[in-house]
Amino acid sequence: MVMSRGRIPRLGAAVLVALTTAAAACGADSQGLVVSFYTPATDGATFTAIAQRCNQQFGGRFTIAQVSLPRSPNEQRLQLARRLTGNDRTLDVMALDVVWTAEFAEAGWALPLSDDPAGLAENDAVADTLPGPLATAGWNHKLYAAPVTTNTQLLWYRPDLVNSPPTDWNAMIAEAARLHAAGEPSWIAVQANQGEGLVVWFNTLLVSAGGSVLSEDGRHVTLTDTPAHRAATVSALQILKSVATTPGADPSITRTEEGSARLAFEQGKAALEVNWPFVFASMLENAVKGGVPFLPLNRIPQLAGSINDIGTFTPSDEQFRIAYDASQQVFGFAPYPAVAPGQPAKVTIGGLNLAVAKTTRHRAEAFEAVRCLRDQHNQRYVSLEGGLPAVRASLYSDPQFQAKYPMHAIIRQQLTDAAVRPATPVYQALSIRLAAVLSPITEIDPESTADELAAQAQKAIDGMGLLP
């Protein structure tokens, strides 16, 4: 899942998307050879821009036309699946959520990278790619996609309320209780509604505790199969329950998602938050607009004019520095809290991978398009202009990247030692069943919930459908 937000002005983005979608519809008859490039609508502007950059490099040999899928990941997956099962020959390159790799590979919908006629796809996908993103691109020891964007959650906190950021979840819960007793904002902002955000949170806690939902091959449930695995599952569940029931907890915690967590922090209700890096840009933008009571950036004269005509924060480099420097007194970031003290968390990552559809009529050009879309220059553009963390390790040493992402060192480390969600062709069913058992987190009984999670996970991999 990708939770970052783009930075291209929305009006221009809409025009670009419309033009490239029209080009894809026209097809090869009017445009020459066209490679379609299906991406989530949320990042359509960014992907349109890098497609156009590639088209300039190709010099007319062929063109890439970005086409927007729906905004909802579930609807994106369904549309691609329908096109592939219907043998849609206009489908060439697909931006796949990182959890779809096994499903698309097992179904034969995505070509293995070894099918690249030029023989370059596998090496290109591996070279300079961080280990976490790369781990999401394979199935059964074979690469089926090339990472193009990634994401990891951090701890965000109030330095004016918290002396030092908690390093583990026990310290998080203790700090929230201390703040509540002192009459200060005490919520821990999380994603705990019945959905993918809750599964991501649970998976991070589980893997950080030494456990896993499934075996590496996706064939066996490993939540309670050994005493050590059961202990890890119970530990993760205890943390979920404790966060929800500690004194001063968010009373609406069972309905929270990424957006409501961000808002709780910006409104001054939460002093601690685990969330994706999009909250950094959101905090600065809304503070400049006067919407963050504890961070009145709207009162800084040098930031005048940094909000454009459509309400987006588009600062100069100097304005960004001023806003960021001012924010540090009340808005900090730190590594994701550990489960075991002294052992860094293994944080579940999101992102997108590029795969070539089995239905493509232009195999060589589609694989070449993938290489261009994720090359060093376009990775830099995606990160700096699109607000999507890079998958290429070398970019984390780029001074401009570091300026745009002050938390770059934490992001890189967490992407190097990351957790991934269970690799299985039935991930959709597995996720739905896990979320149903975990929700509401206020009613978790760690021991019995561990058993129910294992039972529902087994039903998912046995092909018993989506409903618990």
From Swiss-Prot:
Membrane topology category: Lipid-anchor
Lipidation (N-palmitoyl cysteine): 26
Domain of life assignment: Bacteria
Assigned keywords, A-Z: Cell inner membrane, Cell membrane, Disulfide bond, Lipoprotein, Membrane, Palmitate, Signal, Sugar transport, Transport
GO molecular function annotations of the record: trehalose transmembrane transporter activity
Cellular component terms (Gene Ontology): ATP-binding cassette (ABC) transporter complex; periplasmic space; plasma membrane
Biotechnological applications listed in the UniProt record: Being a receptor for trehalose, which is essential for the survival and virulence of M.tuberculosis, this protein is a potential target for antitubercular drug design.
Disruption phenotype: Mutants show no growth on trehalose as the sole carbon and energy source, but grow normally on glucose. They secrete substantial amounts of trehalose during growth on glycerol.
Residues annotated to bind alpha,alpha-trehalose: 97, 151, 276, 278, 351, 421
Pfam family, one: SBP_bac_1
Residues annotated as signal peptide: 1-25
Residue positions of covalent lipid attachment, annotated as S-diacylglycerol cysteine: 26
Primary location class: membrane
Gene Ontology biological process terms in this record: biological process involved in interaction with host; trehalose transport
Quaternary state and interactors: Monomer. The complex is composed of two ATP-binding proteins (SugC), two transmembrane proteins (SugA and SugB) and a solute-binding protein (LpqY).
Similarity comment text for this entry: Belongs to the bacterial solute-binding protein 1 family.
Name assigned to this protein: Trehalose-binding lipoprotein LpqY
Lineage of the organism: Bacteria, Bacillati, Actinomycetota, Actinomycetes, Mycobacteriales
Gene from which the chain derives: lpqY
